[in-house]
Amino acid sequence: MLQRARLWPPIFTSRCAPFPFSRSISIPYRRMAGVPSTYDAPVHIAVIGGTGISSLPGFELAATLDVDTPWGKPSSPISILQHNSPTTGKPVPVAFLSRHGLHHEHAPHEVKNQANIAALRHIGVRTIIAFSAVGSLQEEVRPRDFVVPDQIIDRTKGIRPFTFFEKGMVGHVGFGDPFDKSLAEIVRKCGHSLEGEGVRLHDKGLLICMEGPQFSTRAESNLYRTWGGSVINMSALPEAKLAREAEISYQMICMATDYDCWRGDGSEDVNVEMVMAHMKANAENARRFVGAVLNELTKEEHGELVLAKHIEGQMRFAGAMTKKEGRGQDAEKKLQWLFPGYFD
């Protein structure tokens, strides 16, 4: 069974501040002999993608981490890769996590979102670039176009665990702008630098996140169009909400692979073959786009943004609403693990 946001093409470099390397490595499906299982330095940037992430020119594999969290293990081991910063020349680590598992074993409602975000924060991540294949809900968003969404409508059904604050620890966080505006600007800058070479980028868009794993009915697809929906997937939530609770800057990059099922007489309805064909055809553009964003983020000038200083500490107050005597012991321990020093 496949679903949008499940398979993402291998990531390579781009011409937007190109990498000074040509060698590529493959992210392993099992631990490679001699690869460390620990990494001592904090890792501030992460990529969450599908099982298709398989090679990254310019990166060297530094470690493969099996992280345990109070919410269980994440969807996959975390691969730590390094490349030299284009401004300082120093090695910069980037974490990679496969949303649906190394073998694509987690359906959208089974993705271990809490463990994924908790594990990334625990190793130091404060910026996440997420990737998703999407269906287009508008004529102008063509298959193979990229979209940097700025809003989400939640059409999941409460099946997926969607908060860290529950069972005796209440916390509320703002989600008016579900994606980080400053991070989005960097993503757009890199995308526009590639336009004219097969890349078409839409700066904004309303993303509908549905439950899945089935695709939409025609009535649903047309309803979402009347709401102003631009694209639709099954992966943005609760991932983005949990990232906000974890004080992590988050932006998703979407690649359209189909027109869902609203267009024409039904002969163009989304199917797995259609999705895979467009992803394969657009793989090189996706690699270049992703590589450009990562290379830009590792520049020294973006240090404050990458550390998410603009949202640091927001949960210290928002998550401390429950008085000490009313807190669930297990819930408090979990949050103390996620936010050391916040709720002591």
Curated annotation (Swiss-Prot):
Phosphate binds at T51, R99, H100, S132, A133, S235. It catalyses: S-methyl-5'-thioadenosine + phosphate = 5-(methylsulfanyl)-alpha-D-ribose 1-phosphate + adenine. It is found in: Cytoplasm; Nucleus. GO terms for molecular function: mRNA binding; S-methyl-5-thioadenosine phosphorylase activity. It is an enzyme of class 2 (transferase). The keyword Cytoplasm applies. Its main location: cytoplasm. Pfam families: PNP_UDP_1. SUPFAM superfamilies: Purine and uridine phosphorylases (SSF53167). The keyword Transcription does not apply. It comes from the Eukaryota. Its EC number is 2.4.2.28. Belongs to the PNP/MTAP phosphorylase family. MTAP subfamily. HAMAP family: MTAP. Catalyzes the reversible phosphorylation of S-methyl-5'-thioadenosine (MTA) to adenine and 5-methylthioribose-1-phosphate. Involved in the breakdown of MTA, a major by-product of polyamine biosynthesis. Responsible for the first step in the methionine salvage pathway after MTA has been generated from S-adenosylmethionine. Has broad substrate specificity with 6-aminopurine nucleosides as preferred substrates. Homotrimer. This is S-methyl-5'-thioadenosine phosphorylase.
